[in-house]
Amino acid sequence: MRQLKGRNRCNRAVRHLKIQGKMWLKNLKSGLEQIRESQVRGTRKNFLHDGSFHEAVAPVLAVAQCFCLMPVCGISAPTYRGLSFNRRSWRFWYSSLYLCSTSVDLAFSIRRVAHSVLDVRSVEPIVFHVSILIASWQFLNLAQLWPGLMRHWAAVERRLPGYTCCLQRARPARRLKLVAFVLLVVSLMEHLLSIISVVYYDFCPRRSDPVESYLLGASAQLFEVFPYSNWLAWLGKIQNVLLTFGWSYMDIFLMMLGMGLSEMLARLNRSLEQQVRQPMPEAYWTWSRTLYRSIVELIREVDDAVSGIMLISFGSNLYFICLQLLKSINTMPSSAHAVYFYFSLLFLLSRSTAVLLFVSAINDQAREPLRLLRLVPLKGYHPEVFRFAAELASDQVALTGLKFFNVTRKLFLAMAGTVATYELVLIQFHEDKKTWDCSPFNLD
């Protein structure tokens, strides 16, 4: 009997040593990984980068200003304190001139559509122009709010848990710039393919020069009123490029905001994940709850500023997805048209999905602390933990489309169902018409 008890005691000791050994090896591996990540070459750029959202998003805003959007002064300043909005700056007048030219272009497009057969395809230029015009106006209003918004953003960032190394600190900015760069390059490729497809297969040229023929078709709404001239044709093409970029930039900008806000919540979640399995003082949970509340307040302030852009982005993407899927039934006049069309459709679907996933990550990260609080040991429960859990369970933290819908992962299924429903309705009234006419305006 004594031998059996001794053997059981020995087995328990061996199991305990195995568990302790596994935990020790796991902690050692984690420590070695952190040391490996921290062994980054100490360049001047690494030490100057402060990991702020203002610094990360500055290049994206600089590109936007080249295309008449977000006329904020001081975006290249090292901190948010250099930001300002000035109605006397060239950026403001540049954006105002763009709004006026877009309004005039919209008037010519409405005139052209009014003299044609009205259907879901013919109103495409009007929907495109109206979407960009309203979005540009929203960006102009956002530029006035941007300095105050970045001031609040920086105040919340200062309260967040710090990064463990300079590599981790620079990672969100690199990710943000990479996503923006890829989307801008693909958007440029799409526009170049549209030009190639028209020039390659101009089956009823209006002028002997293929470049002039393309420019005439690209600004057909202008030359139904004015006689053709090269300077007006190039102005029309520049306007078309600005409109095309503005449409893509809406989605890029919303992705940047989604990545920045979700990274804030992710930093809080990483701190909670490290501490949640051990008893923590009540002061820690008070700090965590108040920090979470300050992030939520920032998200709601951002939502008040960009919810109009969110509604336009999702609405226009939904319309053009339905329209492009309807056009896919038609016969393509050439292989160049087919390559451009399906590349454009794939890019539109991918970009719309990316916007939804990046923005819905805010809601995903906001729900993560509720899962982590279930891991708090019994000895570590305090009234602040219950209060924190109650706030997490009752809050709906997400960006919205002008309060009409919350951007969560569930919205993906809702949009997919809407697209399927409208496609079934449109197909019933569809006829295989010659949608690829001589005017490449519909291709841009």
From Swiss-Prot:
Q: Which gene encodes it?
A: Gr5a
Transmembrane helix recorded as keyword: yes
Topological domains on the Extracellular side lie at 78-178, 236-240, 327-338, 432-444
Q: Which GO terms describe its molecular function?
A: ligand-gated monoatomic ion channel activity; sweet taste receptor activity; taste receptor activity
One of the Pfam families matching this protein, by short name: Trehalose_recp
Q: Which ranges does the record mark as transmembrane? A: 57-77, 179-199, 215-235, 241-261, 306-326, 339-359, 411-431
Q: Which GO terms describe its cellular component?
A: membrane; plasma membrane
**How does a null allele present?**
Flies exhibit trehalose-specific physiological and behavioral defects (reduced response by chemosensory neurons of the labellar taste hairs).
Membrane topology classification: Multi-pass membrane protein
PANTHER family to which the protein is assigned, alphabetical: GUSTATORY RECEPTOR, GUSTATORY RECEPTOR 5A FOR TREHALOSE-RELATED
What is the protein's known function? Gustatory receptor required for response to the sugar trehalose in taste neurons. Gr5a neurons selectively respond to sugars, in contrast to Gr66a cells which respond to bitter compounds. Flies are attracted to sugars and avoid bitter substances, suggesting that Gr5a neuron activity is sufficient to mediate acceptance behavior. Sugar signal transduction occurs through coupling with G-proteins such as Galpha49B and G-salpha60A.
Q: Source taxonomy lineage?
A: Eukaryota, Metazoa, Ecdysozoa, Arthropoda, Hexapoda
Effect the entry attributes to changing residue 216 to H:
In strain: AK10, KY02-C315, KY02-C335, KY02-C402, KY02-C469, KY02-C516, KY02-C310, KY02-C319, KY02-C320, KY02-C330, KY02-C336, KY02-C342, KY02-C347, KY02-C355, KY02-C358, KY02-C382, KY02-C393, KY02-C404, KY02-C411, KY02-C432, KY02-C435, KY02-C449, KY02-C467, KY02-C483, KY02-C486, KY02-C488, KY02-C492, KY02-C496, KY02-C514, KY02-C519, Tananarive and w cv
Please state what the protein is called.
Gustatory receptor 5a for trehalose
Q: In which tissues is it expressed?
A: Expressed in labellar chemosensory neurons.
Q: Keyword set for this entry?
A: Cell membrane, Membrane, Receptor, Transducer, Transmembrane, Transmembrane helix
Single GO biological process annotation from the record: monoatomic ion transmembrane transport
Q: Which domain of life is it from?
A: Eukaryota
Note the effect listed for residue 185 to I.
Answer: In strain: KY02-C336
Task: Give the Cytoplasmic membrane side ranges.
Answer: 1-56, 200-214, 262-305, 360-410
Regarding protein family, the annotation reads: Belongs to the insect chemoreceptor superfamily. Gustatory receptor (GR) family. Gr5a subfamily.
Tell me if rRNA-binding is a UniProt keyword of this record: no
**Localization of this protein:** Cell membrane
Q: Which InterPro entries match?
A: Gustatory_rcpt (IPR009318)
Q: What is its main location?
A: membrane
Q: What is the effect of changing residue 19 to V?
A: In strain: AK17, Berkeley, Canton-S, EP(X)496, KY02-C304, KY02-C305, KY02-C312, KY02-C341, KY02-C419, KY02-C470 and w cx
